[in-house]
């Protein structure tokens, strides 16, 4: 795009770097405690946590997740009644203007007592605390195939069991497979949530071992850490400086 607008612009000299995953933040978050905790992790329940923006674009994936839980509740009530779903910081609007995206869908299915939603944003280290303490982390995607959530890094670095529900063409799924993170369920279009729900039911709720599976391929993930990408950025600056020095001597 820039090359089309500026004839002097050379795309060959462009390097695109993603944001790095800040492992040091998680080390610091281990000793952090929210001033007003939203979740009681010691109440004997299983707490599944989603932290980040929500919205109508996530309705299909959320509806499938909640439908899967509804079916599990019908067939395995003793286990399902101990499960809690928490959605934190789902809207950018300041209080009291936040708009719920998860609770309305839960109400449609009659499972709202198992779901909490905090629309307002929370401090960064509070969010990391909730992810680290969760029995499982939820990574719920948009029905937009091009959607790539930057929050996938914290979801992985929490090193907790991870459930991903994304469009099959989302870059997030490719990345999760590359680093062997989580249990993923994909969909091709946002029409048949019932079929997706039954896959989530069988592969996640009905598979306790999957719900205990945590971690990822540390070696495959290393190039995406803040330390590795800072090194890469320094290399880019060195290359740019070398080009400038060469040009100045011509």
Positions of PLM-derived features:
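A charged, aromatic-enriched C-terminal amphipathic alpha-helix characteristic of glycosyltransferases
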Residues: 188-195, 208-239
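A short, active-site helix/loop in glycosyltransferases that binds the activated sugar's phosphate group
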Residues: 1-13
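Acidic donor-binding loop of glycosyltransferase active sites
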Residues: 114, 129-145
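Nucleotide-activated donor-binding/catalytic signature segment of Leloir-type glycosyltransferases, i.e.
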Residues: 82, 87-91, 96-121
């Amino acid at each position: 795009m820039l090359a089309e607008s500026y004839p002097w612009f050379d795309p060959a000299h462009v390097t695109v770097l993603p944001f790095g995953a800040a492992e040091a933040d998680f080390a610091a978050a281990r000793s952090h405690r929210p001033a007003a905790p939203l979740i009681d992790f010691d109440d004997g329940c299983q707490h599944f946590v989603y932290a980040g923006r929500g919205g109508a674009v996530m309705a299909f994936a959320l509806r499938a997740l909640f439908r899967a839980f509804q079916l599990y509740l019908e067939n395995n009530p003793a286990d399902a009644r101990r499960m809690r779903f928490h959605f934190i910081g789902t809207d950018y609007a300041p209080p009291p203007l936040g708009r719920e995206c998860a609770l309305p869908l839960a109400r449609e299915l009659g499972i709202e007592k198992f779901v909490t939603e905090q629309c307002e944003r929370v401090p960064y280290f509070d969010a990391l605390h909730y992810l680290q303490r969760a029995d499982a982390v939820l990574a719920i995607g948009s029905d937009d195939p091009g959607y790539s959530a930057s929050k996938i890094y914290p979801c992985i670095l929490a090193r907790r069991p991870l459930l991903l529900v994304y469009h099959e063409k989302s870059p997030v799924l490719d990345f999760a497979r590359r680093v062997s993170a989580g249990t993923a369920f994909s969909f091709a279009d946002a029409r048949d949530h019932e079929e997706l729900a039954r896959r989530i039911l069988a592969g996640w709720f009905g598979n306790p071992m999957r719900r205990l599976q945590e971690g990822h391929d540390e070696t495959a993930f290393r190039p995406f850490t803040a330390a590795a990408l800072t090194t890469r950025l320094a290399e880019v600056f060195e290359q740019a400086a070398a080009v400038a020095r060469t040009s100045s001597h011509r």
